[in-house]
Structure formats: C-alpha cells, structure tokens
C-alpha cells in the first residue's frame, strides 16, 4: 500500500495525517512559497492575483513571504499552494509548449465553468473551491477526459 510522504503508520497500521503538525508545516513552508513565487512569475501574476491565490494574506505577510521570512504556513495556505502547483504541473503535461502552458491561466476559456473568462479570473474570484475545481479539470484533461 502506497502512502503520502506526510503520513506515518502508527501501531495497528493506521495512517496518521501529519500535514497539520506544525513541524511538518514549517518544513514544507519555505519550499512551498519559493515554488509558488516561481509559478507566479511564470504565469505573470500581479501582486493582487498572487495574494488572492494565497488566500489574501495581509500585505505585510505577503512581503515577508517574498523576502523568504515564512515560518510555518497555515494549512489552508499550504493547500492553496499545493493546488496551484498541481495545476501548473498538469498544464505542463498537457501542453509541451511551455509558453502555452504558462499562458493558459490567462487565456479566455470556453469551458462552461469559466463562462469565457480566463481560468485565473475564476480562481481569483472563487477562492480555494475554485482552485480545487480547476485542479480537477486539468487533471481530468490530463487523464484524457474533455
């Protein structure tokens, strides 16, 4: 049985989710933030778009993140970054043309979910639920579903 890297099998072979553990969150936070800002740069996101995808942290908190002063991110923030990373990865699998993969979030989209607007607008306006929906969509497309 395969298990996630942030789970631990305790006595009785029950997997325990460690993602809420502050030590685990601290260990994951700095690399997650660096990855997020690299994706934000590739996608050409504004500061407002970045903050929206991160869950609207205070401006001072956002600037601390940019400076590398991260600490242990909230579980919600780590989840948001994980979703953005998953979307980015799926797009780069779907579209071998790196420029197209990176532009996709800003292109008008005919999918009914987006109503002709870019996926980025949907994600910025829709919060974490929209991030989940876009992640499911690109993963489904990657798996061959339209």
Short names for language-model regions:
Residues 1-146:
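Non-transmembrane "mature" sequence context
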């Amino acid at each position: 049985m395969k298990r996630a890297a942030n789970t631990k099998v305790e006595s009785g072979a029950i997997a325990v989710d460690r993602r809420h553990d502050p030590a685990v969150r601290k260990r994951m936070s700095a690399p997650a933030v660096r990855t997020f800002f690299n994706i934000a740069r590739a996608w050409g996101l504004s500061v407002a778009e970045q903050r929206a995808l991160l869950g609207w942290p205070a401006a001072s908190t956002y600037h601390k993140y940019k400076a590398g002063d991260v600490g242990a991110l909230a579980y919600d923030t780590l989840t948001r970054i994980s979703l953005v990373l998953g979307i980015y990865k799926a797009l780069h699998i779907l579209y071998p043309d790196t420029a197209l993969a990176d532009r996709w979030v800003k292109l008008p989209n005919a999918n009914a979910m987006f109503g002709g607007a870019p996926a980025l607008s949907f994600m910025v306006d829709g919060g974490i639920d929209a991030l989940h929906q876009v992640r499911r969509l690109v993963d489904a497309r990657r798996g061959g579903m339209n």
